[in-house]
Protein backbone atom coordinates (compact mmCIF):
# COMPACT_ATOMS: atom_id res chain seq x y z
CA UNK A 1 0.00 0.00 0.00
CA UNK A 2 2.88 2.38 0.70
CA UNK A 3 4.03 2.10 -2.90
CA UNK A 4 0.51 2.91 -4.10
CA UNK A 5 0.40 6.00 -1.89
CA UNK A 6 3.83 7.12 -3.09
CA UNK A 7 2.56 6.78 -6.65
CA UNK A 8 -0.54 8.86 -5.83
CA UNK A 9 1.61 11.58 -4.23
CA UNK A 10 3.94 11.60 -7.25
CA UNK A 11 0.94 12.08 -9.55
CA UNK A 12 -0.22 15.00 -7.40
CA UNK A 13 3.27 16.54 -7.50
CA UNK A 14 3.38 16.19 -11.29
CA UNK A 15 0.01 17.91 -11.56
CA UNK A 16 1.03 20.79 -9.27
CA UNK A 17 4.28 21.20 -11.21
CA UNK A 18 2.37 21.31 -14.51
CA UNK A 19 0.03 23.93 -13.00
CA UNK A 20 2.99 26.07 -11.89
CA UNK A 21 2.29 25.64 -8.18
CA UNK A 22 5.61 23.81 -7.71
CA UNK A 23 8.88 24.68 -9.45
CA UNK A 24 10.13 22.21 -12.06
CA UNK A 25 13.00 19.87 -11.28
CA UNK A 26 11.98 18.75 -7.79
CA UNK A 27 12.75 15.06 -7.23
CA UNK A 28 11.95 14.39 -3.57
CA UNK A 29 12.28 10.98 -1.94
CA UNK A 30 8.63 10.51 -1.02
CA UNK A 31 8.38 9.05 2.48
CA UNK A 32 5.30 7.14 3.60
CA UNK A 33 5.22 5.58 7.07
CA UNK A 34 2.76 3.53 9.09
CA UNK A 35 1.03 5.61 11.75
CA UNK A 36 1.22 4.52 15.38
CA UNK A 37 -2.10 6.11 16.34
CA UNK A 38 -4.90 4.85 14.09
CA UNK A 39 -6.95 7.98 14.85
CA UNK A 40 -4.38 9.63 12.55
CA UNK A 41 -5.09 7.18 9.75
CA UNK A 42 -3.08 4.22 8.54
CA UNK A 43 -0.24 5.97 6.69
CA UNK A 44 1.39 9.39 6.92
CA UNK A 45 3.68 11.45 4.69
CA UNK A 46 5.70 14.59 5.43
CA UNK A 47 5.97 15.54 1.74
CA UNK A 48 4.28 18.94 2.24
CA UNK A 49 6.83 19.92 4.88
CA UNK A 50 9.71 18.72 2.69
CA UNK A 51 8.63 20.86 -0.27
CA UNK A 52 7.15 23.90 1.48
CA UNK A 53 10.36 25.96 1.30
CA UNK A 54 11.16 25.38 -2.41
CA UNK A 55 7.47 25.95 -3.15
CA UNK A 56 7.49 29.22 -1.17
CA UNK A 57 4.39 28.13 0.74
CA UNK A 58 3.34 27.24 4.26
CA UNK A 59 3.33 23.44 4.76
CA UNK A 60 -0.39 23.26 5.55
CA UNK A 61 -1.26 25.37 2.50
CA UNK A 62 0.79 23.07 0.27
CA UNK A 63 -0.80 20.04 1.97
CA UNK A 64 -4.25 21.34 1.01
CA UNK A 65 -3.20 21.72 -2.62
CA UNK A 66 -1.67 18.23 -2.62
CA UNK A 67 -4.89 16.70 -1.30
CA UNK A 68 -6.87 18.49 -3.97
CA UNK A 69 -4.49 17.18 -6.65
CA UNK A 70 -4.47 13.56 -5.44
CA UNK A 71 -6.20 11.16 -7.88
CA UNK A 72 -9.11 9.16 -6.49
CA UNK A 73 -8.16 5.66 -5.37
CA UNK A 74 -10.43 2.82 -4.24
CA UNK A 75 -7.99 1.85 -1.50
CA UNK A 76 -8.11 5.26 0.22
CA UNK A 77 -11.20 6.40 2.11
CA UNK A 78 -9.97 9.91 2.94
CA UNK A 79 -6.86 12.07 3.40
CA UNK A 80 -6.51 14.61 6.21
CA UNK A 81 -3.96 17.21 7.28
CA UNK A 82 -2.46 16.83 10.74
CA UNK A 83 -0.12 18.98 12.82
CA UNK A 84 2.28 21.21 10.89
CA UNK A 85 1.41 19.62 7.54
CA UNK A 86 1.41 15.82 7.64
CA UNK A 87 -0.81 14.04 5.13
CA UNK A 88 -2.71 11.24 6.88
CA UNK A 89 -4.17 8.51 4.67
CA UNK A 90 -7.10 6.39 5.87
CA UNK A 91 -7.58 3.01 4.18
CA UNK A 92 -10.92 1.99 2.74
CA UNK A 93 -12.11 -0.92 4.92
CA UNK A 94 -13.88 -2.69 2.06
CA UNK A 95 -10.81 -2.46 -0.18
CA UNK A 96 -8.61 -3.67 2.69
CA UNK A 97 -10.92 -6.64 3.26
CA UNK A 98 -10.67 -7.52 -0.43
CA UNK A 99 -6.86 -7.47 -0.21
CA UNK A 100 -7.00 -9.85 2.74
CA UNK A 101 -9.36 -12.19 0.89
CA UNK A 102 -6.87 -12.29 -1.99
CA UNK A 103 -4.04 -13.01 0.46
CA UNK A 104 -6.03 -15.84 2.07
CA UNK A 105 -6.55 -17.44 -1.34
CA UNK A 106 -2.86 -17.16 -2.29
CA UNK A 107 -0.14 -19.65 -1.27
CA UNK A 108 2.23 -16.65 -1.00
CA UNK A 109 -0.22 -14.70 1.19
CA UNK A 110 -0.34 -12.01 -1.48
CA UNK A 111 3.40 -11.37 -1.13
CA UNK A 112 5.31 -10.91 -4.36
CA UNK A 113 8.56 -9.12 -5.11
CA UNK A 114 8.54 -5.68 -6.65
CA UNK A 115 11.03 -5.64 -9.50
CA UNK A 116 12.99 -8.43 -11.17
CA UNK A 117 14.28 -11.46 -9.28
CA UNK A 118 18.00 -11.47 -8.49
CA UNK A 119 20.72 -14.08 -8.02
CA UNK A 120 21.87 -13.48 -4.46
CA UNK A 121 24.89 -15.11 -2.84
CA UNK A 122 24.58 -15.31 0.95
CA UNK A 123 27.89 -15.85 2.79
CA UNK A 124 27.00 -17.23 6.22
CA UNK A 125 28.17 -19.31 9.20
CA UNK A 126 31.82 -19.86 8.12
CA UNK A 127 33.23 -21.58 11.22
CA UNK A 128 36.90 -22.45 11.46
CA UNK A 129 37.21 -26.20 11.08
CA UNK A 130 39.22 -28.57 13.29
CA UNK A 131 37.31 -27.46 16.39
CA UNK A 132 33.68 -27.45 17.46
CA UNK A 133 31.29 -24.60 16.74
CA UNK A 134 30.83 -22.20 19.66
CA UNK A 135 28.26 -19.54 20.53
CA UNK A 136 30.14 -16.98 18.45
CA UNK A 137 29.08 -18.86 15.31
CA UNK A 138 25.36 -18.59 16.08
CA UNK A 139 24.70 -15.08 14.80
CA UNK A 140 26.16 -15.41 11.30
CA UNK A 141 24.47 -18.78 10.89
CA UNK A 142 20.90 -17.91 11.89
CA UNK A 143 20.77 -14.27 10.74
CA UNK A 144 22.12 -15.28 7.33
CA UNK A 145 19.68 -18.19 7.18
CA UNK A 146 16.72 -15.96 8.03
CA UNK A 147 17.55 -13.39 5.37
CA UNK A 148 18.20 -16.13 2.79
CA UNK A 149 14.75 -17.61 3.50
CA UNK A 150 13.07 -14.22 3.05
CA UNK A 151 14.89 -13.61 -0.24
CA UNK A 152 13.78 -17.02 -1.53
CA UNK A 153 10.19 -16.41 -0.44
CA UNK A 154 10.20 -13.16 -2.41
CA UNK A 155 11.38 -14.98 -5.53
CA UNK A 156 15.15 -14.44 -5.61
CA UNK A 157 17.53 -17.27 -6.47
CA UNK A 158 19.67 -17.71 -3.36
CA UNK A 159 23.09 -19.39 -3.43
CA UNK A 160 24.34 -20.14 0.08
CA UNK A 161 28.11 -20.14 0.55
CA UNK A 162 29.63 -21.51 3.75
CA UNK A 163 33.13 -20.01 3.61
CA UNK A 164 34.60 -22.32 6.26
CA UNK A 165 38.12 -21.83 7.59
CA UNK A 166 39.57 -25.10 6.30
CA UNK A 167 43.17 -23.97 5.72
CA UNK A 168 45.93 -22.52 7.86
CA UNK A 169 48.30 -23.07 10.75
CA UNK A 170 45.82 -24.98 12.92
CA UNK A 171 46.08 -27.92 10.52
CA UNK A 172 49.87 -28.04 10.83
CA UNK A 173 49.36 -28.26 14.57
CA UNK A 174 46.92 -31.17 14.21
CA UNK A 175 49.14 -32.97 11.72
CA UNK A 176 52.12 -32.69 14.05
CA UNK A 177 50.09 -34.07 16.95
CA UNK A 178 48.86 -36.94 14.77
CA UNK A 179 52.44 -37.82 13.85
CA UNK A 180 53.54 -37.65 17.47
CA UNK A 181 50.67 -39.76 18.85
CA UNK A 182 49.36 -41.95 16.01
CA UNK A 183 47.58 -44.54 18.15
CA UNK A 184 46.08 -42.14 20.68
CA UNK A 185 45.17 -39.62 18.01
CA UNK A 186 43.07 -42.12 16.08
CA UNK A 187 40.83 -42.71 19.08
CA UNK A 188 40.77 -39.04 20.08
CA UNK A 189 39.56 -37.81 16.70
CA UNK A 190 35.97 -38.51 17.70
CA UNK A 191 36.39 -35.69 20.24
CA UNK A 192 37.73 -33.09 17.84
CA UNK A 193 37.69 -30.31 20.44
CA UNK A 194 39.75 -32.38 22.88
CA UNK A 195 42.12 -33.34 20.08
CA UNK A 196 42.54 -29.68 19.13
CA UNK A 197 43.17 -28.62 22.75
CA UNK A 198 45.83 -31.30 23.21
CA UNK A 199 47.57 -30.21 20.00
CA UNK A 200 47.35 -26.53 20.98
CA UNK A 201 48.85 -27.28 24.39
CA UNK A 202 51.85 -28.96 22.73
CA UNK A 203 52.15 -26.08 20.24
CA UNK A 204 52.24 -23.48 23.04
CA UNK A 205 54.64 -25.43 25.26
CA UNK A 206 57.14 -26.91 22.79
CA UNK A 207 59.11 -24.75 20.31
CA UNK A 208 60.22 -27.93 18.51
CA UNK A 209 56.59 -29.05 18.11
CA UNK A 210 55.63 -25.56 16.85
CA UNK A 211 58.44 -25.63 14.27
CA UNK A 212 57.34 -29.06 13.09
CA UNK A 213 53.74 -27.84 12.82
CA UNK A 214 54.82 -24.92 10.64
CA UNK A 215 56.85 -27.23 8.42
CA UNK A 216 53.82 -29.50 7.99
CA UNK A 217 51.76 -26.48 6.88
CA UNK A 218 54.36 -25.90 4.16
CA UNK A 219 54.14 -29.59 3.16
CA UNK A 220 50.34 -29.40 3.13
CA UNK A 221 50.42 -26.32 0.92
CA UNK A 222 52.90 -28.09 -1.39
CA UNK A 223 50.43 -30.95 -1.85
CA UNK A 224 52.05 -33.72 0.22
CA UNK A 225 49.81 -36.77 -0.23
CA UNK A 226 49.78 -37.95 3.40
CA UNK A 227 49.22 -34.43 4.74
CA UNK A 228 46.33 -33.95 2.33
CA UNK A 229 44.80 -37.30 3.32
CA UNK A 230 44.79 -36.37 7.01
CA UNK A 231 43.65 -32.82 6.24
CA UNK A 232 40.62 -34.22 4.39
CA UNK A 233 39.92 -36.47 7.38
CA UNK A 234 40.03 -33.58 9.85
CA UNK A 235 37.71 -31.56 7.62
CA UNK A 236 35.22 -34.39 7.09
CA UNK A 237 34.91 -34.99 10.83
CA UNK A 238 34.62 -31.28 11.57
CA UNK A 239 32.03 -30.69 8.84
CA UNK A 240 29.94 -33.60 10.09
CA UNK A 241 29.86 -31.92 13.52
CA UNK A 242 28.78 -28.66 11.87
CA UNK A 243 26.08 -30.38 9.83
CA UNK A 244 24.62 -32.01 12.94
CA UNK A 245 24.28 -28.54 14.50
CA UNK A 246 22.78 -27.03 11.34
CA UNK A 247 20.19 -29.80 11.29
CA UNK A 248 19.41 -29.31 14.96
CA UNK A 249 19.05 -25.55 14.49
CA UNK A 250 16.83 -26.04 11.44
CA UNK A 251 19.26 -24.05 9.28
CA UNK A 252 19.18 -24.56 5.51
CA UNK A 253 22.85 -25.43 5.04
CA UNK A 254 24.29 -28.63 3.62
CA UNK A 255 27.65 -30.01 2.54
CA UNK A 256 26.85 -28.81 -0.98
CA UNK A 257 26.97 -25.21 0.29
CA UNK A 258 30.53 -25.51 1.64
CA UNK A 259 33.03 -23.43 -0.31
CA UNK A 260 35.91 -22.99 2.09
CA UNK A 261 39.10 -20.97 1.97
CA UNK A 262 41.00 -23.86 0.38
CA UNK A 263 38.69 -23.79 -2.65
CA UNK A 264 40.37 -20.56 -3.76
CA UNK A 265 44.00 -21.61 -3.21
CA UNK A 266 44.75 -22.17 -6.90
CA UNK A 267 43.48 -18.69 -7.81
CA UNK A 268 45.50 -16.74 -5.23
CA UNK A 269 48.69 -16.34 -7.35
CA UNK A 270 46.50 -15.17 -10.24
CA UNK A 271 44.73 -12.62 -8.06
CA UNK A 272 48.10 -11.09 -7.13
CA UNK A 273 49.32 -11.27 -10.74
CA UNK A 274 46.17 -9.55 -12.01
CA UNK A 275 46.47 -6.78 -9.43
CA UNK A 276 50.10 -6.30 -10.51
CA UNK A 277 49.13 -6.22 -14.19
CA UNK A 278 46.68 -3.41 -13.45
CA UNK A 279 49.37 -1.42 -11.66
CA UNK A 280 47.61 -1.63 -8.30
CA UNK A 281 50.38 -3.24 -6.23
CA UNK A 282 52.97 -1.45 -4.13
CA UNK A 283 55.75 -3.21 -2.23
CA UNK A 284 55.87 -2.23 1.42
CA UNK A 285 58.47 -3.91 3.68
CA UNK A 286 58.56 -6.81 1.24
CA UNK A 287 54.78 -7.30 1.24
CA UNK A 288 52.56 -6.71 -1.78
CA UNK A 289 49.88 -4.13 -0.94
CA UNK A 290 47.06 -2.20 -2.55
CA UNK A 291 46.75 1.42 -1.40
CA UNK A 292 43.46 3.22 -2.05
CA UNK A 293 42.99 6.93 -1.48
CA UNK A 294 39.81 6.58 0.57
CA UNK A 295 41.44 4.44 3.31
CA UNK A 296 43.70 6.17 5.83
CA UNK A 297 44.61 5.59 9.47
CA UNK A 298 44.01 8.02 12.35
CA UNK A 299 47.20 9.93 11.46
CA UNK A 300 46.04 10.37 7.87
CA UNK A 301 48.54 7.90 6.43
CA UNK A 302 47.43 5.45 3.72
CA UNK A 303 46.20 2.05 4.93
CA UNK A 304 47.47 -0.98 3.01
CA UNK A 305 45.36 -3.92 1.89
CA UNK A 306 48.04 -6.63 2.09
CA UNK A 307 47.52 -9.40 -0.46
CA UNK A 308 50.88 -11.21 -0.18
CA UNK A 309 53.27 -11.37 2.77
CA UNK A 310 56.98 -10.78 2.40
CA UNK A 311 57.56 -14.53 2.65
CA UNK A 312 55.16 -15.21 -0.21
CA UNK A 313 52.15 -16.31 1.84
CA UNK A 314 48.62 -15.09 1.18
CA UNK A 315 46.11 -13.48 3.52
CA UNK A 316 42.37 -13.35 4.16
CA UNK A 317 42.13 -10.37 1.82
CA UNK A 318 43.59 -12.40 -1.05
CA UNK A 319 41.14 -15.24 -0.46
CA UNK A 320 38.21 -12.83 -0.15
CA UNK A 321 39.17 -11.15 -3.43
CA UNK A 322 39.30 -14.56 -5.12
CA UNK A 323 35.91 -15.48 -3.62
CA UNK A 324 34.40 -12.19 -4.78
CA UNK A 325 35.67 -12.78 -8.32
CA UNK A 326 34.28 -16.35 -8.27
CA UNK A 327 30.88 -15.13 -7.10
CA UNK A 328 30.76 -12.57 -9.88
CA UNK A 329 32.22 -14.64 -12.71
CA UNK A 330 31.07 -18.20 -11.98
CA UNK A 331 28.00 -17.79 -9.78
CA UNK A 332 26.82 -14.74 -11.78
CA UNK A 333 25.59 -13.01 -8.64
CA UNK A 334 23.65 -9.76 -8.82
CA UNK A 335 24.09 -9.24 -5.09
CA UNK A 336 26.41 -10.73 -2.45
CA UNK A 337 25.64 -10.49 1.27
CA UNK A 338 28.41 -11.19 3.81
CA UNK A 339 27.11 -12.05 7.29
CA UNK A 340 30.34 -11.50 9.18
CA UNK A 341 31.21 -9.87 12.52
CA UNK A 342 30.88 -6.07 12.54
CA UNK A 343 34.53 -5.82 13.59
CA UNK A 344 35.49 -6.85 10.04
CA UNK A 345 33.76 -3.78 8.53
CA UNK A 346 36.96 -2.02 7.42
CA UNK A 347 38.37 -5.25 5.97
CA UNK A 348 35.32 -5.73 3.76
CA UNK A 349 35.16 -2.06 2.76
CA UNK A 350 38.73 -2.37 1.49
CA UNK A 351 38.19 -5.75 -0.20
CA UNK A 352 35.06 -4.49 -1.97
CA UNK A 353 36.78 -1.29 -3.10
CA UNK A 354 39.79 -3.25 -4.36
CA UNK A 355 37.58 -5.77 -6.20
CA UNK A 356 35.84 -2.90 -8.01
CA UNK A 357 39.10 -1.08 -8.74
CA UNK A 358 40.58 -4.26 -10.21
CA UNK A 359 37.49 -5.00 -12.29
CA UNK A 360 36.91 -8.33 -10.52
CA UNK A 361 33.18 -7.55 -10.24
CA UNK A 362 30.83 -5.65 -12.55
CA UNK A 363 29.74 -2.19 -11.47
CA UNK A 364 26.14 -3.38 -11.18
CA UNK A 365 26.90 -6.11 -8.63
CA UNK A 366 25.96 -5.22 -5.06
CA UNK A 367 28.50 -6.16 -2.37
CA UNK A 368 27.14 -5.72 1.15
CA UNK A 369 28.72 -6.50 4.51
CA UNK A 370 25.86 -7.41 6.86
CA UNK A 371 27.82 -6.91 10.06
CA UNK A 372 26.60 -8.01 13.48
CA UNK A 373 27.51 -7.35 17.10
CA UNK A 374 28.58 -9.79 19.78
CA UNK A 375 26.53 -12.12 21.95
CA UNK A 376 27.37 -11.53 25.61
CA UNK A 377 26.46 -13.25 28.86
CA UNK A 378 23.71 -11.98 31.20
CA UNK A 379 26.29 -9.68 32.85
CA UNK A 380 27.02 -7.98 29.53
CA UNK A 381 30.51 -9.47 29.31
CA UNK A 382 31.72 -11.95 26.68
CA UNK A 383 29.82 -15.24 27.00
CA UNK A 384 32.11 -17.76 28.73
CA UNK A 385 31.86 -20.98 30.71
CA UNK A 386 32.37 -20.84 34.50
CA UNK A 387 36.05 -21.65 34.03
CA UNK A 388 36.46 -18.89 31.45
CA UNK A 389 36.33 -21.11 28.38
CA UNK A 390 34.35 -20.71 25.18
CA UNK A 391 30.75 -21.96 25.34
CA UNK A 392 30.16 -24.67 22.75
CA UNK A 393 27.03 -24.21 20.70
CA UNK A 394 25.91 -27.76 21.48
CA UNK A 395 26.13 -27.00 25.22
CA UNK A 396 23.97 -23.91 24.79
CA UNK A 397 21.29 -25.84 22.88
CA UNK A 398 21.34 -28.71 25.38
CA UNK A 399 20.73 -26.32 28.26
CA UNK A 400 18.00 -24.48 26.35
CA UNK A 401 16.12 -27.71 25.66
CA UNK A 402 16.46 -28.87 29.27
CA UNK A 403 15.19 -25.56 30.64
CA UNK A 404 12.31 -25.63 28.15
CA UNK A 405 11.52 -29.20 29.22
CA UNK A 406 11.29 -28.16 32.88
CA UNK A 407 9.14 -25.16 31.97
CA UNK A 408 6.70 -27.13 29.79
CA UNK A 409 6.48 -29.97 32.34
CA UNK A 410 5.64 -27.52 35.13
CA UNK A 411 2.75 -26.16 33.06
CA UNK A 412 1.61 -29.51 31.58
CA UNK A 413 2.58 -32.33 34.00
CA UNK A 414 0.03 -34.65 32.41
CA UNK A 415 1.79 -34.77 29.02
CA UNK A 416 3.55 -37.97 27.96
CA UNK A 417 7.34 -37.91 28.18
CA UNK A 418 7.93 -38.11 24.42
CA UNK A 419 5.47 -35.25 23.84
CA UNK A 420 7.17 -33.18 26.54
CA UNK A 421 10.55 -33.74 24.90
CA UNK A 422 9.21 -32.88 21.45
CA UNK A 423 7.66 -29.61 22.63
CA UNK A 424 10.76 -28.78 24.69
CA UNK A 425 12.98 -29.26 21.65
CA UNK A 426 10.90 -26.86 19.55
CA UNK A 427 10.55 -24.27 22.33
CA UNK A 428 14.20 -24.49 23.40
CA UNK A 429 15.72 -24.13 19.94
CA UNK A 430 13.21 -21.45 18.91
CA UNK A 431 13.93 -19.46 22.07
CA UNK A 432 17.69 -19.42 21.48
CA UNK A 433 17.28 -18.38 17.86
CA UNK A 434 14.55 -15.81 18.45
CA UNK A 435 16.45 -14.17 21.32
CA UNK A 436 19.19 -13.45 18.80
CA UNK A 437 17.09 -12.71 15.72
CA UNK A 438 14.86 -10.24 17.58
CA UNK A 439 17.82 -7.92 18.25
CA UNK A 440 19.15 -5.55 15.60
CA UNK A 441 22.04 -7.45 14.06
CA UNK A 442 24.44 -4.50 14.43
CA UNK A 443 23.90 -4.40 18.21
CA UNK A 444 25.60 -6.39 20.93
CA UNK A 445 23.13 -8.22 23.17
CA UNK A 446 23.08 -10.09 26.47
CA UNK A 447 21.93 -13.69 26.37
CA UNK A 448 19.52 -14.53 29.20
CA UNK A 449 17.74 -17.89 29.49
CA UNK A 450 15.06 -16.59 31.87
CA UNK A 451 14.05 -13.76 29.55
CA UNK A 452 14.12 -15.77 26.33
CA UNK A 453 11.95 -18.59 27.77
CA UNK A 454 9.30 -16.22 29.12
CA UNK A 455 5.74 -16.42 27.79
CA UNK A 456 5.53 -12.64 28.10
CA UNK A 457 7.16 -10.05 25.88
CA UNK A 458 8.85 -10.34 22.50
CA UNK A 459 9.91 -13.99 22.84
CA UNK A 460 9.56 -17.24 20.92
CA UNK A 461 7.27 -18.87 23.54
CA UNK A 462 4.88 -15.91 23.29
CA UNK A 463 4.66 -16.20 19.50
CA UNK A 464 4.43 -19.99 19.53
CA UNK A 465 1.58 -19.72 22.02
CA UNK A 466 -0.19 -17.13 19.84
CA UNK A 467 -0.10 -19.61 16.96
CA UNK A 468 -1.51 -22.40 19.15
CA UNK A 469 -4.49 -20.15 20.00
CA UNK A 470 -5.29 -19.93 16.29
CA UNK A 471 -4.91 -23.70 15.92
CA UNK A 472 -7.13 -24.14 18.98
CA UNK A 473 -9.97 -22.15 17.41
CA UNK A 474 -10.12 -24.44 14.38
CA UNK A 475 -9.59 -27.55 16.51
CA UNK A 476 -12.63 -26.57 18.58
CA UNK A 477 -14.59 -25.75 15.42
CA UNK A 478 -13.77 -29.14 13.94
CA UNK A 479 -13.36 -27.67 10.45
CA UNK A 480 -10.63 -26.18 8.31
CA UNK A 481 -10.77 -22.75 6.70
CA UNK A 482 -11.51 -24.36 3.32
CA UNK A 483 -14.90 -25.35 4.72
CA UNK A 484 -15.75 -21.82 5.84
CA UNK A 485 -17.67 -19.53 3.50
CA UNK A 486 -18.52 -15.88 3.77
CA UNK A 487 -16.31 -12.82 3.33
CA UNK A 488 -14.14 -10.70 5.58
CA UNK A 489 -15.97 -7.64 6.92
CA UNK A 490 -14.07 -5.15 9.07
CA UNK A 491 -16.40 -3.54 11.59
CA UNK A 492 -14.93 -3.63 15.09
CA UNK A 493 -11.91 -1.50 15.93
CA UNK A 494 -9.88 -4.63 16.78
CA UNK A 495 -10.77 -6.21 13.43
CA UNK A 496 -9.58 -3.15 11.55
CA UNK A 497 -6.31 -2.91 13.49
CA UNK A 498 -5.54 -6.61 12.94
CA UNK A 499 -6.41 -6.34 9.24
CA UNK A 500 -4.17 -3.30 8.74
CA UNK A 501 -1.22 -5.16 10.29
CA UNK A 502 -1.84 -8.28 8.17
CA UNK A 503 -1.78 -6.13 5.03
CA UNK A 504 1.75 -4.90 5.89
CA UNK A 505 3.38 -8.36 5.64
CA UNK A 506 4.68 -8.00 2.08
CA UNK A 507 6.17 -4.54 2.55
CA UNK A 508 7.78 -5.68 5.79
CA UNK A 509 9.46 -8.65 4.10
CA UNK A 510 10.73 -6.37 1.32
CA UNK A 511 12.44 -4.22 3.98
CA UNK A 512 14.00 -7.28 5.64
CA UNK A 513 15.36 -8.43 2.27
CA UNK A 514 16.71 -4.98 1.46
CA UNK A 515 18.38 -4.28 4.81
CA UNK A 516 19.24 -7.81 5.97
CA UNK A 517 17.50 -7.20 9.31
CA UNK A 518 15.34 -10.10 10.54
CA UNK A 519 14.61 -8.27 13.81
CA UNK A 520 12.07 -6.25 11.81
CA UNK A 521 10.16 -9.46 11.06
CA UNK A 522 10.32 -10.41 14.76
CA UNK A 523 8.87 -7.02 15.74
CA UNK A 524 6.13 -7.39 13.13
CA UNK A 525 5.13 -10.86 14.36
CA UNK A 526 5.14 -9.67 17.98
CA UNK A 527 2.86 -6.75 17.08
CA UNK A 528 0.63 -9.07 15.04
CA UNK A 529 0.33 -11.52 17.94
CA UNK A 530 -0.61 -8.67 20.28
CA UNK A 531 -3.29 -7.38 17.91
CA UNK A 532 -4.66 -10.90 17.51
CA UNK A 533 -4.82 -11.26 21.30
CA UNK A 534 -6.86 -8.05 21.52
CA UNK A 535 -9.12 -9.24 18.68
CA UNK A 536 -9.50 -12.68 20.31
CA UNK A 537 -10.52 -11.18 23.66
CA UNK A 538 -12.87 -8.48 22.32
CA UNK A 539 -14.44 -10.07 19.23
CA UNK A 540 -16.14 -13.43 19.92
CA UNK A 541 -15.24 -15.82 17.11
CA UNK A 542 -17.11 -19.10 17.51
CA UNK A 543 -19.73 -17.37 19.68
CA UNK A 544 -20.24 -14.44 17.28
CA UNK A 545 -23.72 -12.94 17.06
CA UNK A 546 -24.43 -14.30 13.58
CA UNK A 547 -22.97 -16.68 10.98
CA UNK A 548 -21.65 -13.93 8.69
CA UNK A 549 -19.70 -12.32 11.55
CA UNK A 550 -18.44 -15.73 12.72
CA UNK A 551 -17.19 -16.63 9.25
CA UNK A 552 -15.55 -13.24 8.77
CA UNK A 553 -13.70 -13.58 12.07
CA UNK A 554 -12.70 -17.16 11.28
CA UNK A 555 -11.23 -15.96 8.01
CA UNK A 556 -9.29 -13.22 9.79
CA UNK A 557 -8.11 -15.80 12.34
CA UNK A 558 -6.99 -18.18 9.60
CA UNK A 559 -5.01 -15.47 7.80
CA UNK A 560 -3.39 -14.46 11.09
CA UNK A 561 -2.39 -18.07 11.73
CA UNK A 562 -0.94 -18.52 8.27
CA UNK A 563 0.98 -15.24 8.55
CA UNK A 564 2.39 -16.14 11.96
CA UNK A 565 3.39 -19.60 10.75
CA UNK A 566 4.96 -18.26 7.55
CA UNK A 567 6.80 -15.53 9.43
CA UNK A 568 8.19 -17.98 11.97
CA UNK A 569 9.25 -20.36 9.19
CA UNK A 570 11.10 -17.51 7.49
CA UNK A 571 12.99 -17.02 10.76
CA UNK A 572 13.79 -20.74 10.71
CA UNK A 573 11.49 -21.59 13.65
CA UNK A 574 9.17 -24.58 13.92
CA UNK A 575 5.60 -24.10 15.16
CA UNK A 576 3.41 -26.22 17.45
CA UNK A 577 -0.31 -26.96 17.14
CA UNK A 578 -0.61 -27.10 20.92
CA UNK A 579 1.58 -26.37 23.94
From Swiss-Prot:
Q: Which Pfam families match?
A: Arg_tRNA_synt_N (PF03485), DALR_1 (PF05746), tRNA-synt_1d (PF00750)
Q: Which UniProt keywords apply?
A: Aminoacyl-tRNA synthetase, ATP-binding, Cytoplasm, Ligase, Nucleotide-binding, Protein biosynthesis
Record's superkingdom?
Bacteria
What GO terms are given for molecular function? arginine-tRNA ligase activity; ATP binding
Motif 'HIGH' region is found at 127-137
Q: What Gene Ontology terms describe where this protein resides (cellular component)? A: cytoplasm
Enzyme class at the top of the EC tree = ligase
Major subcellular location class: cytoplasm
GO biological process terms on file: arginyl-tRNA aminoacylation
Q: Which HAMAP family match?
A: Arg_tRNA_synth
The entry assigns this protein to a family as follows: Belongs to the class-I aminoacyl-tRNA synthetase family.
Q: Could you describe the subunit structure of this protein? A: Monomer.
Entry protein name: Arginine--tRNA ligase
Amino acid sequence: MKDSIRHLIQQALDRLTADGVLPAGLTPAIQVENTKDKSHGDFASNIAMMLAKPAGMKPRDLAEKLIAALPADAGIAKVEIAGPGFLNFFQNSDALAQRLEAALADAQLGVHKNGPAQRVVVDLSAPNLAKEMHVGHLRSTIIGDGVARVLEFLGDTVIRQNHVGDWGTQFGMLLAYMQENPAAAESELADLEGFYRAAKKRFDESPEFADRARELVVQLQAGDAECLRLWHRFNDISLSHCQALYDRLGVKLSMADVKGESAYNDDLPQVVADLAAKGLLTEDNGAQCVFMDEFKNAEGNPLPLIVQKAGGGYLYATTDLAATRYRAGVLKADRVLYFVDQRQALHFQMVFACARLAGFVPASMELEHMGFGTMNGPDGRPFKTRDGGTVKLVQLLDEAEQRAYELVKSKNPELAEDELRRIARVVGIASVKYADLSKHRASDYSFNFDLMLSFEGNTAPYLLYAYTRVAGVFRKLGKGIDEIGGRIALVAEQEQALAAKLAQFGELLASVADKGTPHMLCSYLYDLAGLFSSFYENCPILAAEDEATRDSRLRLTALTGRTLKQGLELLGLETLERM
